[in-house]
């Protein structure tokens, strides 16, 4: 069975990079805002969500992650946070929000693919 991956990223170029990096792992669904991301999480029930920590317009990927993990219908979904914020406190905040993994930008397409594949296999 094909895996389903939801990419939540507000920047078009990064959304495309993540999509190209992960397309071999399954069916890709895209969202460009926190609200659209949560709507698609509930409707699509993806196996993995890649989630930008800062989604623009004051939206926080950490809040989206908390919402995913606090809802019994979606708590099982793996979340991979992506952020340019690489301080230890940022990583800890992401993991405390419920993320299964945290990657610091910039990253290579290969390292993103490997991290996503590991989460999908877990």
Language-model-derived ranges and their functions:
Residues 12-29:
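Two-component/phosphorelay signaling modules centered on CheY-like receiver
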Residues 33-36, 59-63:
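Acidic catalytic/metal-coordinating carboxylates
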